[in-house]
A protein has these predicted regions:
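DNA breakage-rejoining catalytic core of tyrosine-based enzymes
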Residues: 109-128, 186-198, 212-217, 229-234
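Basic, alpha-helical nucleic-acid-contacting "clamp/cap" segments
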Residues: 170-226, 239-243, 247
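Short, basic (Lys/Arg/His-rich) helix/loop patches that form interaction surfaces
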Residues: 212-213, 237-264, 268-282, 301
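Short, leucine-enriched amphipathic alpha-helices that occur as contiguous helical runs
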Residues: 126, 141-143, 233, 237, ...
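Basic, Lys/Arg- and aromatic-enriched nucleic-acid-binding interface segment
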Residues: 124-156
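Catalytic-site neighborhood detector that most strongly recognizes the C-terminal catalytic loop/helix
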Residues: 284-305
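Short, charged phosphate-coordinating catalytic segments
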Residues: 149-173, 282
Length: 305
């Protein structure tokens, strides 16, 4: 039965109120994605004459089938979002039913194309990207960000979260960096990673211009002056794509780069350099060998040579 306007308002009010309980337990990006997923689900139910909460197994299956144009990862996340709201509202949860699992498996099997992976910013690309940075404060910051992100195999959110306090300048001109929190480390136990001498030099040059008195390692620059706040993680994506474009790469290649490219490219380079899986997992903070394998799929590494 289609809920009326009053019921829809009550549903929206109830779930959004309960949803706030998740704050602090999940990353902000995950919260935003779940929130958008539930909005989509509620609107779909309204248009389909169905009740969203509690949703029946039939309703959730029908919703998932309607979402089959999206990537399986997106559909799976929407299942998790629906599950979480049912749990928060103390309602019977339909998402553990076997029919839900079978519906998702059908959607996943219907996808014949391989999941798209960000183009790796390998060392050869890194060298090109560093070479096209301007000779000004923005260039100092950009070079330090690109080189540090590559050496630490960071996600973009990890890179912009680093503080000056997290960086130890070593006598051999390298850096020891504490990455405090990551997507797979919500508890914030952190991991330690190391850099090359080149990265140590680039970070030092950036800080000598900016000063050591700000907490964020990387910060915005406004009218030639550093601003004491962290950069948005979208800055990393824009930086990499802009560097690829300025380096004269093919537009299709430019489009394939993303904020994840540093992590992908560095992992591929470590594989080609002969490092074993355990060493690569430690360097990048991977907990799952299956996830790492996805990163290494496109590495140009011929084991027969």
């Amino acid at each position: 039965m289609k809920p009326n306007d009053a019921q829809l308002f009550s549903i929206s009010s109830d779930w959004q109120s309960e949803f706030k309980r998740l704050e602090g337990a999940y990353a902000p990006s995950t919260m935003r994605a779940y929130h958008a997923d539930i909005e989509i689900y509620i609107q779909w139910c309204a248009l389909s004459d169905r009740t969203p909460f509690p949703g029946s197994v039939e309703t959730v299956c029908a919703f998932l089938l309607d979402q089959d144009s999206f990537a399986p990862a997106t559909v799976r996340r929407r299942v998790y979002a629906i599950r979480k709201v049912h749990q928060l509202l103390r309602l019977p949860d339909p998402t553990y039913d076997e029919d839900i699992n079978l519906t998702f498996r059908r959607i996943r099997r219907s996808k014949t194309s391989r999941p798209r992976q960000a183009k790796g910013m390998t060392k050869s690309y890194l060298d090109k990207f560093l070479a096209v940075q301007p000779d000004n404060p923005w260039g100092l910051r950009n070079k330090a960000m690109l080189s540090l992100g590559y050496d630490l195999l960071t996600r973009r959110s990890e890179l912009v979260a680093i503080t000056v306090e997290d960086v130890e300048f070593r006598s051999d001109e390298t850096l020891r960096v504490l990455i405090r929190r990551s997507k797979t480390d919500p508890g914030g136990y952190g991991r330690v990673a190391f850099t090359s001498k080149r990265t140590g030099t680039l970070v030092t040059e950036w800080l000598e211009w900016r000063g050591y008195n700000f907490e964020p390692l990387f910060c915005p620059i406004y009218q030639g002056h550093a601003v004491n706040r962290h950069l948005s993680d979208t800055t990393v994506k824009h930086l990499i794509k802009s560097a690829a474009k300025n380096a004269g790469l093919d537009p299709n290649d430019v489009n394939d780069f993303s904020g994840h490219s540093m992590r992908v490219g560095a992992a591929q380079d470590l594989l080609k350099a002969g490092h074993d899986t355990a060493a690569i997992m430690r360097a990048g903070g991977w907990k799952s060998i299956n996830v790492l394998t996805r990163y290494l799929e496109n590495a140009e590494c011929n084991v027969w040579l």
